[in-house]
């Protein structure tokens, strides 16, 4: 698990109907990792959110897009990719 000393800001752009989004959200919850979820379908700034997803994916509307505090991002990551990015693998 990530310690309180290494807390990073994580923002996940996704939707409730997206199975990869649901899986990524479960990964964060199961590992006690705080994150902000922005739902493409429900956010009042829907146009900004959609343009952010498209910008990070070279024009593709693939989700989830998970953005980290260093401005890097992962699109449709596996749990193993998330664990590696977050330093959970030993």
Regions found by a protein language model. Name each.
Residues 2-34:
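Local sequence-structure signature of Cys/Sec-based thiol-disulfide redox active-site neighborhoods
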Residues 40-60, 88-89:
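Thioredoxin-like thiol-disulfide oxidoreductase module
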Residues 52-75:
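Short, structured active-site "lid" loops
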Residues 68-90:
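Non-catalytic, surface beta->alpha helical segment in thiol-disulfide oxidoreductase systems
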């Amino acid at each position: 698990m990530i310690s309180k000393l290494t807390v990073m800001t994580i923002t996940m752009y996704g939707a409730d109907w997206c199975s990869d989004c649901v899986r990524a959200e479960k990964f964060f919850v199961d590992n006690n990792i705080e994150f902000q979820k922005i739902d493409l379908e429900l956010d009042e700034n829907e146009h900004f959110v959609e343009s952010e997803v498209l910008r990070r994916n070279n024009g593709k509307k693939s989700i989830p897009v998970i953005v980290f505090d260093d401005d890097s991002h992962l699109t449709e990551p596996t749990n193993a990719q998330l664990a590696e990015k977050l330093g959970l693998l030993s």
